[in-house]
Each structure stands twice: as structure tokens, then as C-alpha cells.
């Protein structure tokens, strides 16, 4: 029997060929390689289409590039990402929960614009100085936003949508208010969405070619590069990697059933996909982090999140070096907690307000004299030693606080904050001059050999290298700390308790600073070993993950994932001079996507029941392609949306936008099936439906454009636009009429210069100025300790009143508020 070819020629504007189904020895099978003609049907080969795409590009550019210079002050998260660009240019290390690529791109653009990092983007509403190329940085973001629209058009064409429908779908995306808003400012969302769109586009392009062809491999490589760049901008890109991986498994499954494919060719394709779609993204991810570490070489406040080994790779760090190695009785030491960022075992002359009401023992993250402890033998406290005695495993000691002259102490009292925990006891500092202490001051050193450096550090305590536990001799509990903060009375320092259970690593300590008068000057010294690239890479990811999951503080504009598909509320980005910028989606497109997802789900369920009842299913090529492509895109929607329900951190509407992009792609196919199948005998009617939908989308965009561009509006128009109560932009800020704006004088709020700018320093001798005098002066006050760490004014007041602290220096900056 001769083999009959089922593929048939189609019109250029109808790019969905028939499925190529062949009869095998036992069953029919689908030929997975597309027709050689498919690529020509779905790519721009006509002058008309090229001109249409050019017009689309111009239209999109006008929308996104319009008025980028306004607002001329910091908007929303430009506070963070503009500030990070400044840090890159200055080379000062900072901490962020996102990978570095998008931030580095902004820094590169700013550097090309001559930016010296002399503006910190400190507060929303701070006016940009003339030295900050913020328009250029926003232009970069807007350009990526415009290119994303073109990528959507090309993606729809590659997945089988006819030219005119793809064009109108892309225009709907171009006027989607939320995407316009995020692409006009210095935010991570525009680069992220561009890279995700590029990955989707490249993978859909790959599907047009035979699996082992050169064009297919080129498209796979492009997909891998885009996935790497998306993942290197925000971890959301990993969801896109997952989506591509699921589609690869889908296609490989059908390839296994394709009798025209040999096992060798299938393995070759599988290996290529692993290399291009996992290997390339991971390699790029590593490269971008390497550049990140190489660019940020100076120690700064952001580096305080990291280990001493990490910080020792940075210039101007304050990490102790050349520490005396041997620790013994009579040594004055500082004890550092291993597993939290809490810092050093600390005490100060403030008591607990409840419990024993004895002196507080805490963790303090900065170097300070109140971190110093003298090691004493438990049965000879205060005894003068004549020979050096090493601190070994099993030694029973007491820790004498050198500043307040009391000893580390535990007893049967509830801890100050974790009072509901029956496995933790209070740790205090107890004693007074002339008092030798009691048995509740006794602690037994237990060296943790597994976590200590190999060799002598496992036998006796060596500074930095030996990790050990301190067991309370009376109760058997261990000196413990965890990420629980004391209230204001404890200066928000980290709680220290004595734990009879809990995580082992939270009971581990090590000696950082160490001195002993009985050791000779030439005694062996030790320093932190600078972290390798891999160590820094791993540690930075642990910190990113930890900080990200702990972003749980309530926010006035946060929203829950369940509300996102219904656009119940937006986010205020900026508000000044009787104008607002507010993130809100285009309700016409937004709700259409949500409705279509529900309708498509019902259609699929109905079809499955019909098929189960033995009724024939539709085999029309357009319907088949519609189902396949929509399932692909809704799978992308689900992969990007579902993880939001597992996250316990703050969530905002813009977290929905990657999933929403896939929803709009699926909606594009819904519009196409209306034209190509629902109204197949009256296509003009189908096009009329699509044009009506487009017109409604454009109208919504135009009506709500004042909160995109931060332009004048009236109270009446604003109030009429608030369709839902959650659309809570402030209409009272607007004037009653547009005429009033013509007579308005715009005000500017200048910001403080960056930390590197010149300041007038005045050193104050003696006790310095009083807190009250300083607070009564005009201007913003920033208090810092001697290590440069910013302090809360109320904490400063308490320190001045109760600890005898002094104000040593006043830095005066010329600031216009």
C-alpha cells in the first residue's frame, strides 16, 4: 500500500497544517518532526508583515518611552535597584535577595551615562540630581519592555496564530497597564519579563524545526541563554526553566512513539536538551555571580550578613586577623555564634524586666568591648596564673564579663522571650565585685570534632578553628541562640538561652578575638581563610534564601495570590504634586485571561466526558493546535503562579506578572480560534469580535493612563475610575479641574548625598551635645555607632541615659527637605 501524505498546503494567513499521522505495524503514530514548510508559514517572509511589525514597534515604543523624565524623583523600588546600581559603581558590597544580572545591567547603563554612584536613591520621592542619568536607566527598562511586545507577537506567530490576530493580541499586551508601568522605571521586572519572553519565543521557534537540525540546535541554545539570563535576574526564571523542561519531556514522550525516530537520535536530542537547557543556564548563572563578586570588592553594611571568611575577601574589612591561636585559662576572648547572624556573646548593664531580673546576656552583631569575657577555672575564679594552661575538651570554666564584672549564668527561670518553651532556660550575667560566683556559673567545654578543623583544633580550643558547645554543669543544657529578637528593652539584640534540645548547630560557638598575657609575642597566630568563589556562591544563596523567606512583615499594599486573577487591588508607586503612579492591570485584558482559563477548563472537562462516553472528538487541525498551544501556555501560567501559594513572605501584585504573560499568550490563541474556527464561515464577524476586544483594551489604557505616567487628573474622573474598593489610589490628591494644574508650581524634595560624598565633620570633645539639643535642630538625624552601624533614635536615647554613652562626632550635610 502506498503511503499517503496527509499534509496539505495552507494559506500564509492560516499557518496550521494538518497533523502528519502515519500507520504503523500495530497502531497509527504522530510524526513529531514538523513539515519543512512550517517555518515559512510562521515567520516574517512578506513585506506586509514586516511593515506591520515595524508599526507595532513604533506604537509600543511611543507608549513606553513617553515622558520617561517624569516623575523626576525616585519611584517605588527604584529605592532598591537604583541604589544597588550606585553600590556597583562604587564597588561596595550589598545584600539583596535577587540574583545580580538585572542590577548589573542597570549599573552598566548608568556607568555609560557618566554616573559616579553619588546618589543613593534613598527614599521614594527624592529628586534626582543632574548627575544621575535616571532617564537613560529608565530608557533601558522601557526598551526591554517594548521588545517584549515584539517577542509576544513573534511567539504567537510561531505557535500558529494568524498574522492579524497575533498583531491585535500584541497590541493588547502593549496597552496592558501593568506591563507599561513596570517597564518605565528602574525595576527588575522589565528585564525579567524580556528574558522570559525571549525564552518562550526561542523555544517555540525550536518547535518549528526537525529535532536534529542545525536550526533546532540554534534555537535550543538561544533558549538556554535566555533561561540563564532570566534566572540570573530573579529566581522566578527557574520556573521558566521548569516549564521548558516539562515541554521537553512532553515532546520526548511523543518522540519515543514516533516510529521514524531511532533510539540513537532520541538520546542525541535528550542530551542536547540537557546541555543547552540546563548546562548553559547554570554556566551563565555562575558567570554572572563571578562578575558580581569581582565588581563588589569593598566591605560595607551589606556585607555584615556574611561570614568572616566571606568578608575577609573584601577590601577595608574589619575582620580580626592574626589572632592568637592557643586559647587557655586567663585568656580574654570574644565568643561568636556559628549558625546565625546574631554575632557575639554580649552583656551590658541592663537587666531583664522579668524572670530573674538579672543582667542581660545577648548576641550583638558588632565588635564591642562588651563582647569580652575572661576564661576562669571553675574552682579558682580570680586566681592569678603563672603558667599557660590550654583550654581542652571537658574543661569546666567560668566566663567573667570584663566590663560589668559579672559571670555568665543560667538557672531555672524562663527565658525572656521564648518563655513558652519548656526546653529553654534563661541565661544572664550575675555577680558583683568580690563575689566568686556559684555553681550556676559553671560551664563545660565540649569540642565538636566534626565541625572543627582537622588536627590539634579537635583536641584543644584553637581560635577560629575549634567549634565547641558550652554545657551548663548544673542543668545539662547548652548555651544556645536563635533568630529571636529581644524587645526594645533588650535593644532588639538576639536572645541567648540555655537549651536542653533544639538544633545542634545553634549550640555551636567559636573564639574569634583572643589574648593572653602568659603567651610570648611570637606565639602562633591564625587568620580567617578567605572564602573561595564556590564558598561565597553557596553562602550568598543561603543568605538570599533565608532573608527572602523571612520577609514576612505586613505591608500596606501586599496582596494574596488568590486575589491576583481578579485584580482586586494594586500598588502605590509614587505620589506627589497632586499626581500618582499606581500599578494596576488593564482590567479588560486581565479579566479576559481569568475568564478564558475558567472557560477552557470547562471545555476540556466536557470533551473528556464526551470522549469517555464514546463520542467522536474534533480532529480539525486548528482545534488540535489550539488545544496543544493553550495547554502549553496554561502550563506555563500554572508553573509560575502555583508556587506563590507556598511562599510565606510578603506578596504583591507584580509577582503575578510572569504567570499573567503566559495567560495573555493563551488568550491570543483564544482570539485566533474565534476567527479561524468559531466564525470560520464568517471570518469578518470573528475579526469584529477581536477588534471590539482590542478597542475596549485601548480605551481602558487611555482612561487610566494618568496613574501610569503620573500626569494630571481630576478628582471626579479619578473617583469614577475606582471600579473596585481595592483600587485605592488617593483621588483626593488631584485638583478639581485640569485648569488648576496650569498654575501649579512643582515642588522638589532633595535627597541626602551618597555616603561617599563630602561632608563637614565636627569632632565633639567631652560629653558632646545633648540628645535633646540635637533632636530639636532642624533636619533628619541619623545615629551610628563607632563601627558605622545605623541605630534607632530611641535606642540611642536609652544608651545615652542608662549606659553613659557619648556622642563623639556630628556630621553635617547640606540638605534641602
From Swiss-Prot:
State any further remark: Present with 41500 molecules/cell in log phase SD medium.
What does the record give as its pathway?
Protein modification; protein glycosylation
How is the subunit organization of this protein annotated in UniProt? PMT1 and PMT2 form a functional heterodimer. The complex interacts with endoplasmic reticulum proteins EMP24, ERV25, ERP1, ERP2, CDC48, HRD1, USA1, YOS9, ERO1, PDI1, UBR1, Cue4, DFM1 and TED1. Forms also a minor complex with PMT3.
- Main localisation: endoplasmic reticulum
Name its species. Saccharomyces cerevisiae (strain ATCC 204508 / S288c)
Looking at the keywords, is Disulfide bond present? no
Q: Which SUPFAM superfamilies match?
A: MIR domain
What is the name listed in the Swiss-Prot or TrEMBL entry for this protein?
A: Dolichyl-phosphate-mannose--protein mannosyltransferase 1
Q: Membrane topology for this entry?
A: Multi-pass membrane protein
Swiss-Prot/TrEMBL keywords: Acetylation, Endoplasmic reticulum, Glycoprotein, Glycosyltransferase, Membrane, Repeat, Transferase, Transmembrane, Transmembrane helix
In the UniProt record, does the keyword Transport occur? no
| Role, per record | Protein O-mannosyltransferase involved in O-glycosylation which is essential for cell wall rigidity. Forms a heterodimeric complex with PMT2 and more rarely with PMT3 to transfer mannose from Dol-P-mannose to Ser or Thr residues on proteins. The PMT1-PMT2 complex participates in oxidative protein folding, ER-associated protein degradation (ERAD), as well as ER export. Required for incorporation of proteins in the cell wall.
Q: What class of enzyme is it?
A: transferase
Subcellular location, record wording: Endoplasmic reticulum membrane
GO terms, biological process = ERAD pathway; fungal-type cell wall biogenesis; protein exit from endoplasmic reticulum; protein O-linked mannosylation; regulation of endoplasmic reticulum unfolded protein response
Q: What is its EC number?
A: 2.4.1.109
Glycan attachment sites: 390, 513, 743
User: Which InterPro entries does this entry report, sorted A to Z?
Assistant: GlyclTrfase_39-like (IPR027005), Glyco_trans_39/83 (IPR003342), MIR_dom_sf (IPR036300), MIR_motif (IPR016093), PMT_4TMC (IPR032421)
Amino acid at each position: 500500500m502506498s503511503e499517503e501524505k496527509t499534509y496539505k498546503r495552507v494559506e500564509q494567513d492560516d499557518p496550521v497544517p494538518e497533523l502528519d499521522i502515519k500507520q504503523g505495524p500495530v497502531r497509527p503514530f504522530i510524526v513529531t518532526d514538523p513539515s519543512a514548510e512550517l517555518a515559512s508559514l510562521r515567520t516574517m517572509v512578506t513585506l506586509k508583515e514586516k511593515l506591520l511589525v515595524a508599526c507595532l514597534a513604533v506604537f509600543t515604543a511611543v507608549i513606553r518611552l513617553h515622558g520617561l523624565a517624569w516623575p523626576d524623583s525616585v519611584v517605588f523600588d527604584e529605592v532598591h535597584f537604583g541604589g544597588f546600581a550606585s553600590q556597583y559603581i562604587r564597588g561596595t558590597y550589598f545584600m539583596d535577595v535577587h540574583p545580580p544580572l538585572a542590577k548589573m545591567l542597570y549599573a552598566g547603563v548608568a556607568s555609560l551615562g557618566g554616573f559616579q554612584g553619588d546618589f543613593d536613591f534613598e527614599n521614594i520621592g527624592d529628586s534626582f540630581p543632574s548627575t544621575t542619568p535616571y532617564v537613560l536607566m529608565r530608557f533601558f527598562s522601557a526598551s526591554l519592555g517594548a521588545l517584549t511586545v515584539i517577542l509576544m507577537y513573534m511567539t504567537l506567530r510561531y505557535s500558529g496564530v494568524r498574522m492579524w490576530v497575533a498583531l491585535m493580541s500584541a497590541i493588547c499586551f502593549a496597552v496592558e497597564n501593568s506591563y507599561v508601568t513596570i517597564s518605565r522605571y528602574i525595576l527588575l521586572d522589565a528585564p525579567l519579563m524580556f528574558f522570559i519572553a525571549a525564552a518562550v519565543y526561542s523555544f517555540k521557534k525550536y518547535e518549528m524545526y526537525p529535532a536534529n537540525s542545525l536550526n533546532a540546535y540554534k534555537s535550543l541554545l538561544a533558549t538556554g541563554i535566555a533561561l540563564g539570563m532570566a534566572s540570573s535576574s530573579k529566581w522566578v526564571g527557574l520556573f521558566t526553566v521548569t516549564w521548558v523542561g516539562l515541554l521537553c519531556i512532553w515532546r520526548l514522550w511523543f518522540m519515543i512513539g514516533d516510529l521514524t525516530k531511532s533510539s540513537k537520535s532520541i538520546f542525541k536530542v535528550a542530551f542536547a536538551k540537557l546541555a543547552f537547557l540546563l548546562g548553559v543556564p547554570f554556566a551563565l548563572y555562575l558567570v554572572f555571580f563571578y562578575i558580581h563578586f569581582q565588581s563588589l570588592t569593598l566591605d560595607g553594611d551589606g556585607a555584615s550578613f556574611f561570614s568572616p571568611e566571606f568578608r575577609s575577601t573584601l577590601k577595608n574589612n574589619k575582620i580580626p586577623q592574626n589572632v592568637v591561636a592557643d586559647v587557655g585559662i586567663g585568656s580574654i576572648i570574644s565568643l561568636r555564634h556559628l549558625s546565625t547572624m546574631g554575632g557575639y556573646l554580649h552583656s551590658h548593664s541592663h537587666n531583664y524586666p522579668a524572670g530573674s531580673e538579672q543582667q542581660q546576656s545577648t548576641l550583638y552583631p558588632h565588635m564591642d568591648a562588651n563582647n569580652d569575657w575572661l576564661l576562669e577555672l571553675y574552682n579558682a575564679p580570680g586566681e592569678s596564673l603563672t603558667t599557660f594552661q590550654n583550654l581542652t575538651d571537658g574543661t569546666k570554666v567560668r566566663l567573667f564579663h570584663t566590663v560589668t564584672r559579672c559571670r555568665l549564668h543560667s538557672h531555672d527561670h524562663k527565658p525572656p522571650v521564648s518563655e513558652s518553651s519548656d526546653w529553654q532556660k534563661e541565661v544572664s550575667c550575675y555577680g558583683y565585685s568580690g563575689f566568686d560566683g556559684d555553681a550556676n556559673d559553671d560551664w563545660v567545654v565540649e569540642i565538636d570534632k566534626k565541625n572543627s578543623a582537622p588536627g590539634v583544633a579537635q583536641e584543644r580550643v584553637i581560635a577560629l578553628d575549634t567549634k565547641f558547645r558550652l554545657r551548663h554543669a548544673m542543668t545539662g543544657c547548652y548555651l544556645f541562640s536563635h533568630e529571636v529578637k529581644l524587645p526594645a528593652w533588650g535593644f532588639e539584640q538576639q536572645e541567648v538561652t540555655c537549651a536542653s534540645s533544639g538544633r545542634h548547630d545553634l549550640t555551636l560557638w567559636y573564639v574569634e578575638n583572643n589574648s593572653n598575657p602568659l603567651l610570648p609575642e611570637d606565639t602562633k597566630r591564625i587568620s580567617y581563610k578567605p572564602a573561595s568563589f564556590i564558598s561565597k556562591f553557596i553562602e550568598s544563596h543561603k543568605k538570599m534564601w533565608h532573608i527572602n523567606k523571612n520577609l514576612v512583615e505586613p505591608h500596606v499594599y501586599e496582596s494574596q495570590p488568590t486575589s491576583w486573577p481578579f485584580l482586586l487591588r494594586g500598588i502605590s508607586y509614587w505620589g506627589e504634586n497632586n499626581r500618582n503612579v499606581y500599578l494596576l492591570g488593564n482590567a479588560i485584558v486581565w479579566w479576559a485571561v481569568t475568564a478564558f482559563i475558567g472557560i477552557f477548563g470547562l471545555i476540556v472537562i466536557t470533551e473528556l466526558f464526551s470522549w469517555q462516553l464514546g463520542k467522536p472528538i474534533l480532529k480539525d487541525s486548528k482545534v488540535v493546535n489550539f488545544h496543544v498551544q493553550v495547554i502549553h501556555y496554561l502550563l506555563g501560567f500554572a508553573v509560575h503562579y502555583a508556587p506563590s501559594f507556598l511562599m510565606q513572605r510578603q506578596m504583591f501584585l507584580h509577582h503575578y506578572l510572569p504567570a499573567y504573560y503566559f495567560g495573555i499568550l493563551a488568550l491570543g490563541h483564544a482570539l485566533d480560534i474565534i476567527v479561524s474556527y468559531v466564525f470560520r464561515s464568517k471570518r469578518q464577524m470573528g475579526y469584529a469580535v477581536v477588534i471590539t476586544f482590542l478597542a475596549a483594551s485601548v480605551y481602558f489604557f487611555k482612561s487610566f493612563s494618568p496613574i501610569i505616567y503620573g500626569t494630571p487628573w481630576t478628582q471626579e474622573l479619578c473617583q469614577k475610575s475606582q471600579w473596585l474598593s481595592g483600587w485605592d489610589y488617593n483621588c483626593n490628591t488631584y485638583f478639581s479641574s485640569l485648569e488648576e494644574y496650569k498654575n501649579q508650581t512643582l515642588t522638589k524634595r532633595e535627597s541626602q548625598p551618597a555616603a561617599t560624598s563630602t561632608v563637614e565633620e565636627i569632632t565633639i570633645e567631652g560629653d558632646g551635645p545633648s540628645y535633646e539639643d540635637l533632636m530639636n535642630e532642624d533636619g533628619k538625624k541619623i545615629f551610628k555607632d563607632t563601627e558605622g552601624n545605623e541605630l534607632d533614635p530611641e535606642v540611642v536615647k536609652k544608651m545615652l541615659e542608662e549606659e553613659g554613652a557619648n556622642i563623639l562626632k556630628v556630621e553635617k550635610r547640606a540638605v534641602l527637605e
